[in-house]
């Protein structure tokens, strides 16, 4: 090897999509419509406009902290809800009280914490408000009967996400949550249960 030869070392950031472990489905009784019904009395926005705003909450990256009550009661759908540390539902990251106490300082700059009460148990919904910039050349759509059903491959631009702990995608309407190794390690070092990490690139 000649001394004057230059080599570029390319390091590709590993990205994981965060999913519910074993695809357990919803564990709490809420959806966009029920939450709209619960919150419409806290805003002066016209009902029809507020409904659209709430259904597009994650895609539009809106905040609802200013209309969220101190604590919102939500009923469980699963008897095992209190055994989950961290979960994904309706585009929110669901945190147990213990997971919230641990992750608060890491996630505070990335979104807002919405406190809920589930049968007397304090839990928190985290509304992520940070997007990652997709690498459109590597996001290949999968079509079924002429309609986009999913993506064959998905990727983000490394320079945009390499300093982001947690982020979402505009192409997925803000519903999918993604992370790099740092967040994954935060979860694993405390053995927080309820989610799994699936590498996308």
Label each PLM-derived region with a short phrase.
Residues 1-201:
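Phosphate/anion-contacting hairpin/loop surfaces
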């Amino acid at each position: 090897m000649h001394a004057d030869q230059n080599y570029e070392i390319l390091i590709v950031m590993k990205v994981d999509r965060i999913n519910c472990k074993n695809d357990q489905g919803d564990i709490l009784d809420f959806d966009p419509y029920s939450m709209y019904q619960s919150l419409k009395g806290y805003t002066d926005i016209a009902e029809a406009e507020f409904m659209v705003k709430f259904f597009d909450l994650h895609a539009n990256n809106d905040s609802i902290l200013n209309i969220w009550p101190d604590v919102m009661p939500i009923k469980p759908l699963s008897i095992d809800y209190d055994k989950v540390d961290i979960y994904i539902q309706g585009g929110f990251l669901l945190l147990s009280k213990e997971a919230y106490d641990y992750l608060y300082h890491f996630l505070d700059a990335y979104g807002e914490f919405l406190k809920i009460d589930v049968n007397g148990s304090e839990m928190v919904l985290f509304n992520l408000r940070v997007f990652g910039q997709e690498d459109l050349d590597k996001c290949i759509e999968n079509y079924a009967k002429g309609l986009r059903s999913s993506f064959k491959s998905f990727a983000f631009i490394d320079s945009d996400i390499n300093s982001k702990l947690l982020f979402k995608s505009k192409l997925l309407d803000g519903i999918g949550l993604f992370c790099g190794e740092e967040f994954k390690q935060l979860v694993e070092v405390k053995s927080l249960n309820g989610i799994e990490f699936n590498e996308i690139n």
